[in-house]
From Swiss-Prot:
Keyword DNA damage tagged: no
PROSITE patterns: ATP_GRASP (PS50975), DALA_DALA_LIGASE_1 (PS00843), DALA_DALA_LIGASE_2 (PS00844)
Binding sites annotated in the UniProt record for Mg(2+) 2: E297, N299
Intracellular or extracellular location(s): Cytoplasm
Similarity-based family: Belongs to the D-alanine--D-alanine ligase family.
Keywords: ATP-binding, Cell shape, Cell wall biogenesis/degradation, Cytoplasm, Ligase, Magnesium, Manganese, Metal-binding, Nucleotide-binding, Peptidoglycan synthesis
Chain positions recorded as Mg(2+) 1 binding sites: D284, E297
All residue ranges annotated as the ATP-grasp domain in the record: 124-330
Enzyme nomenclature, EC number: 6.3.2.4
Pathway named in the protein's UniProt entry: Cell wall biogenesis; peptidoglycan biosynthesis
Protein name: D-alanine--D-alanine ligase
Annotated organism of origin: Shewanella baltica (strain OS223)
Amino acid sequence: MSKINLLLLCGGGSAEHDISLMSANYFETSLAKSEQFSVLRVELDKFGQYRTAAGDDCELTNSREIRFRDESKTPWPVDYVIPCIHGYPGETGDIQSYFNLIQLPYFGCESEASSNCFNKITAKMWFSALGIPNTPYIFLNQFDDAAIEQTQTALAQWGSIFVKAASQGSSVGCYKVDDSAKVAGVLKDAFGYAPYVIVEKTIKARELEVAVYEYNGEVVATVPGEIICDTNTFYTFDEKYAKNSKARTDVVAQHVSAEISEQIRAYAIKAFKGMKLRHLSRIDFFLTADNEILLNEINTFPGSTPISMFPKMLQNHGHDFTEYLSLVINGQLTAKS
């Protein structure tokens, strides 16, 4: 039986480029445990150039093959691609549109679902339309005096706010604001990351995460895990990935009642199905001291670094990551044929 030529595409043009490379390491190791796949790892650099792990310049062509700049090398036909790219152009839905155009099967959420979830404003509109509670917010479309005034009003009303670039991940372009004197500077910084900015009420709550994925044709939601940070901070980019991070993760959140856990899982599945997600996601919630559940955000290609929650929660649920990938890939290719 011939092997499946699988392109593992990683990197990308966002601030999460290096995190994508770390996630690709996990995918590469997991795929190597199966004899079904012939894997070619290709990095998409920040300038849009493709390069193999061996350092060969190349490109993905419309005929679904990797063609090398060195013409003495034989083009490599691609059967399937895993776009292990956090942020642009992976989680934004851009590269999925290209795969659709050239009819190349790929792992993960489709273009529209990726785009809807990546834009925090669009996502919150979807959450509300689906009847899933989420944090109070306003959104801004330009940096001007009116935006500063609106944000000042929100801060006065809510006491503490988060200002977030609408289209970034891993807490990039995200700022906690308690002092009105800092509003203008923070807004300017946030607009430097994205053309739209969302301002949310700060919620004093536990941060719970659920891995939601498709397994043997069923949508699975794990029990919630938890991100535990210093009480005076939030889960910043540095807290997530720094070697000296004080944050810790619990694969199973402690002291969460069965009733609350089931409600969180129900909301997670409702969001997954309602927003037409596919294959995998990590869905993040807040749980307040009064047991109020608020959907925070959806990650359509969750990290798979050594500290990432998605693969840990999947395995804790009793599923092997390599087997999971094999089921998804083979199921998709069989359906296509």
